[in-house]
């Protein structure tokens, strides 16, 4: 859709990336690291200073201390961390439960390592359906993948959901991969429920995070993974021969930038304001917005406008009205046939959002 948006000169609310500048303090830190000669390979698991800063951040947020030497690895983005975690644990014939709609890297990665993706759907109103997941578990289930806040749904897992997941995995050897790259994009006073908060989950989980989502630097491809040392040892075996190490000057910059918690504590309010701005405008259109509790994605039902399939409707809206969005069916293995939903990214400048709303109200 980004390609079509470019061809049509449309406002691009399809792909999930910000269109505003990053904090100058952060870009200055990167420049300083380069000028100071930090331009060669970093240690394979990441700079000790950055791993230490991550450990301090995690402990401050969740009250649990990961060992920076054995339980934290810096990665080339969240997607690489997911790829590496799956590569570390999936063997031919293993089953991995994926909750649709799902980020599009999950299923192909499972298949690449010889596993079999087992798809279940979110329930009513894009909520986690614990019973559907429970029914999908078999003796061959190797892992369960969860995502909160959720892309593309914009919903979050709450304490009750996490406890249900812990209950269903207790007594099994199933590994949890918890994709939490939008951890700081949780709105309306809700608390991010991380797998880290639950000992029964934490002891079996790879927990994945992204600096790009938090600090508006998606092009840097910087993230990190947390896991118990036994799991992390397997993770690093793949990581070493996949990327070896992530970008060195950016690691130096992030290690320094994390020292001020305000640099991530202000993120929820920043994006909640953008969510609200877009949502207020969207409610004046013929689209029906779904609940957005986190992430920077807003779903909207267009059933009152058209009965076209979402892929065709999304293309037509881009070509005829100059606004690009993602059809949600592409995030499913087997999309619901009566679903008419588009995903919009509101990680944009206010002017961009206002112009987008004007176009959406014309549909």
Which residues does each PLM region occupy?
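A short helix->loop->beta-strand "cap" motif at the edges of active sites that frequently abuts
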Residues: 115, 171-174, 201-203
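Structural signature of PLP-dependent enzymes
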Residues: 235-240, 257-280, 307-309
């Amino acid at each position: 859709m980004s390609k079509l948006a470019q061809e049509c000169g449309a406002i691009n609310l399809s792909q999930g990336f910000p269109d505003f500048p990053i904090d100058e303090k952060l870009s200055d830190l990167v420049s300083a690291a380069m000028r100071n000669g930090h331009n060669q390979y970093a240690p394979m698991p990441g700079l000790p200073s950055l791993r230490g800063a991550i450990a301090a951040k995690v402990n401050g947020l969740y009250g649990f201390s990961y060992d920076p030497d054995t339980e934290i690895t810096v990665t080339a983005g969240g997607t690489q961390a997911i790829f590496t975690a799956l590569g570390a644990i999936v063997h031919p014939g293993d089953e991995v439960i994926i909750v649709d709609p799902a980020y599009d890297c999950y299923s192909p990665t499972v298949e690449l390592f010889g596993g079999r993706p087992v798809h279940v759907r979110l329930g009513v109103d894009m909520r986690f359906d614990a019973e559907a997941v429970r029914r999908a578990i078999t003796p061959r289930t190797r892992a369960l993948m969860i995502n909160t806040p959720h892309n593309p749904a914009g919903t979050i897992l709450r304490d009750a959901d996490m406890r249900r997941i812990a209950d269903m995995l207790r007594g099994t050897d199933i590994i949890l991969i918890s994709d939490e790259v939008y951890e700081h994009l949780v709105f309306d006073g809700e608390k991010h429920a991380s797998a880290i908060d639950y000992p029964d989950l934490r002891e079996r989980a790879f927990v994945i995070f992204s600096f790009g989502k938090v600090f508006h630097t998606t092009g840097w491809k910087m993230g990190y993974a947390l896991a118990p040392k036994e799991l992390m040892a397997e993770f690093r075996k793949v990581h070493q021969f996949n990327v070896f190490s992530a970008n060195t000057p950016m690691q130096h910059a992030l290690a320094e930038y994390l020292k001020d918690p305000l640099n991530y504590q202000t993120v929820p309010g920043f994006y909640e304001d953008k969510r609200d701005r877009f949502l207020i405008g969207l409610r004046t259109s013929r689209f029906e917005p779904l609940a957005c509790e986190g992430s920077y994605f807003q779903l909207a039902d267009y059933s009152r406008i058209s009965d076209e399939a979402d892929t065709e409707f999304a293309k037509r809206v881009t070509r005829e009205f100059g606004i690009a969005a993602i059809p949600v069916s592409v995030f499913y293995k087997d999309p619901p046939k009566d679903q008419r939903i588009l995903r919009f990214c509101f990680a944009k400048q206010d002017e961009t959002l206002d112009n987008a709303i004007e176009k959406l109200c014309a549909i």
